Every structure is written in structure tokens, then in C-alpha cells.
Amino acid sequence: MASIFSRIIQGELPCEKIDETDNEICFLDISPFTEGHTLVIPKREVARFEELPKTEAFSLMQTMQRVAKAVCKAYGGSDYNIQLNNGPDAGQEVPHVHFHIIPRPDGLRVPKLGTYADGQMADVGARIRACLDS
């Protein structure tokens, strides 16, 4: 059975897409720790990071770097967390490798944001997309 992320990649489920390449898709986390919390996901469905072919792992890292810069620019900070929960014992809830980019402007230390208000995800997505490659 396809993971929820594969279903998003295939267009079966909606997301607030930030970016997409041949190998990756990036979209907002629906239960963010902070506003702008973005997931970077390989299109190949593998449960663990080490299962990705090296070329795809390298591509994933390049996309993470590009999106992290955009998230920082969108939120006026330079600090962020990159998080990977690699396996169920590490807290991985979806068995499809994915990285979290969590902005931390001004040293923000807050509990999980919760959920976005109606229409807020589109605004947040537009804010980050406007900062890609700028």
C-alpha cells in the first residue's frame, strides 16, 4: 500500500506544495512545529534514508539546502532545524523517508504550532515560494 506521501506525490491527496523537482517534492507539514515547517521528500518511496540510491540522496540534500534558504528568507531568520526520524524507534510515523525543515526565527523555542487556520497554508506556501531562488 502506498504511503500517504506517495499518494500526495501521485496527486491523490492535496498539499501546499512549496517546490518540486524530478526526484523530490516539498510541501508544508499539516501539523507544524512552527509556521513554515516544510517537508522535503524523495519521490521514490523508501522507508529509510540509507535505502535511497546515492545520487538521489545527493539530490535530496541539494533540494533541502535550496528550500531551507527560502524558508529562512521568508521568515527573516537564519536558523532552522533539519530533522529526520529514521525508523519507528526514532519517531518516524510515515514509512517514507522525509526531512523536516523547521524555521527558528529569533531563537523561537515554542511547542508544536498545531494546525493552520483555514487559508493560512496557502499564504505561508506563497511566502516561501516567493523566496525560492531569490
State where each predicted segment sits.
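HIT superfamily nucleotide-processing domains
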Residues: 1-134
